[in-house]
Amino acid sequence: MASQQEKKELDARARQGETVVPGGTGGKSLEAQQHLAEGRSKGGQTRKEQLGGEGYHEMGRKGGLSNNDMSGGERAEQEGIDIDESKFRTKK
Protein backbone atom coordinates (compact mmCIF):
# COMPACT_ATOMS: atom_id res chain seq x y z
CA MET A 1 0.00 0.00 0.00
CA ALA A 2 1.26 3.48 -0.83
CA SER A 3 2.36 5.70 2.04
CA GLN A 4 0.47 8.88 2.84
CA GLN A 5 3.23 10.95 1.17
CA GLU A 6 3.12 8.83 -2.00
CA LYS A 7 -0.67 9.18 -2.14
CA LYS A 8 -0.37 12.97 -1.87
CA GLU A 9 2.19 13.03 -4.69
CA LEU A 10 0.04 10.79 -6.90
CA ASP A 11 -3.04 12.90 -6.15
CA ALA A 12 -1.15 16.09 -7.09
CA ARG A 13 -0.05 14.52 -10.39
CA ALA A 14 -3.62 13.35 -11.08
CA ARG A 15 -4.97 16.85 -10.43
CA GLN A 16 -2.53 18.14 -13.08
CA GLY A 17 -4.14 15.80 -15.61
CA GLU A 18 -1.73 12.86 -15.49
CA THR A 19 -3.12 9.33 -15.42
CA VAL A 20 -1.53 7.70 -12.37
CA VAL A 21 -3.78 4.61 -12.12
CA PRO A 22 -4.00 2.16 -15.04
CA GLY A 23 -7.54 2.42 -16.41
CA GLY A 24 -8.17 5.68 -14.56
CA THR A 25 -8.03 7.93 -17.62
CA GLY A 26 -10.18 11.01 -17.15
CA GLY A 27 -10.17 11.05 -13.36
CA LYS A 28 -9.36 14.43 -11.83
CA SER A 29 -7.94 13.02 -8.59
CA LEU A 30 -6.27 9.85 -7.36
CA GLU A 31 -9.50 8.63 -5.78
CA ALA A 32 -11.52 9.38 -8.94
CA GLN A 33 -9.02 7.46 -11.08
CA GLN A 34 -9.17 4.48 -8.72
CA HIS A 35 -12.98 4.43 -8.93
CA LEU A 36 -12.94 4.73 -12.73
CA ALA A 37 -10.44 1.89 -13.07
CA GLU A 38 -12.47 -0.34 -10.78
CA GLY A 39 -15.70 0.37 -12.66
CA ARG A 40 -14.12 -0.27 -16.05
CA SER A 41 -12.70 -3.56 -14.85
CA LYS A 42 -16.06 -4.67 -13.44
CA GLY A 43 -17.84 -3.60 -16.64
CA GLY A 44 -15.55 -5.70 -18.81
CA GLN A 45 -15.90 -8.68 -16.50
CA THR A 46 -19.69 -8.40 -16.51
CA ARG A 47 -19.74 -8.22 -20.31
CA LYS A 48 -17.52 -11.29 -20.52
CA GLU A 49 -19.90 -13.18 -18.22
CA GLN A 50 -22.87 -12.13 -20.37
CA LEU A 51 -21.29 -13.18 -23.66
CA GLY A 52 -19.20 -16.09 -22.48
CA GLY A 53 -15.52 -16.49 -23.24
CA GLU A 54 -15.88 -17.24 -26.95
CA GLY A 55 -18.23 -14.33 -27.65
CA TYR A 56 -16.03 -11.92 -25.75
CA HIS A 57 -13.00 -13.13 -27.71
CA GLU A 58 -14.78 -12.75 -31.07
CA MET A 59 -15.93 -9.25 -30.16
CA GLY A 60 -12.34 -8.35 -29.27
CA ARG A 61 -11.12 -9.66 -32.63
CA LYS A 62 -13.66 -7.52 -34.45
CA GLY A 63 -12.87 -4.42 -32.39
CA GLY A 64 -9.15 -4.90 -32.90
CA LEU A 65 -9.58 -4.69 -36.65
CA SER A 66 -11.19 -1.23 -36.56
CA ASN A 67 -9.21 1.86 -37.50
CA ASN A 68 -9.92 5.51 -38.31
CA ASP A 69 -11.07 4.69 -41.84
CA MET A 70 -13.41 1.75 -41.28
CA SER A 71 -15.14 -0.33 -38.64
CA GLY A 72 -13.90 -3.75 -37.60
CA GLY A 73 -16.74 -5.41 -39.50
CA GLU A 74 -15.94 -3.52 -42.71
CA ARG A 75 -12.25 -4.33 -42.46
CA ALA A 76 -12.89 -8.01 -41.67
CA GLU A 77 -15.11 -8.23 -44.75
CA GLN A 78 -12.54 -6.47 -46.93
CA GLU A 79 -9.68 -8.72 -45.79
CA GLY A 80 -11.74 -11.91 -45.79
CA ILE A 81 -11.50 -12.48 -42.02
CA ASP A 82 -14.36 -14.57 -40.64
CA ILE A 83 -16.00 -13.10 -37.52
CA ASP A 84 -18.71 -15.32 -36.03
CA GLU A 85 -21.24 -12.78 -34.74
CA SER A 86 -23.56 -15.55 -33.55
CA LYS A 87 -21.21 -15.81 -30.57
CA PHE A 88 -22.07 -12.21 -29.58
CA ARG A 89 -25.47 -13.21 -28.19
CA THR A 90 -25.86 -12.91 -24.46
CA LYS A 91 -26.28 -16.12 -22.51
CA LYS A 92 -29.60 -16.66 -20.79
Curated annotation (Swiss-Prot):
Residues 1-92 are annotated as: Disordered. It holds the Pfam family LEA_5. Signal peptide: none annotated. It comes from the Eukaryota. Keywords: Nucleus. The keyword Nucleus applies. Belongs to the small hydrophilic plant seed protein family. Completely disordered protein. Flexible and unstructured in solution. This is Protein EMB-1. The gene is EMB-1.
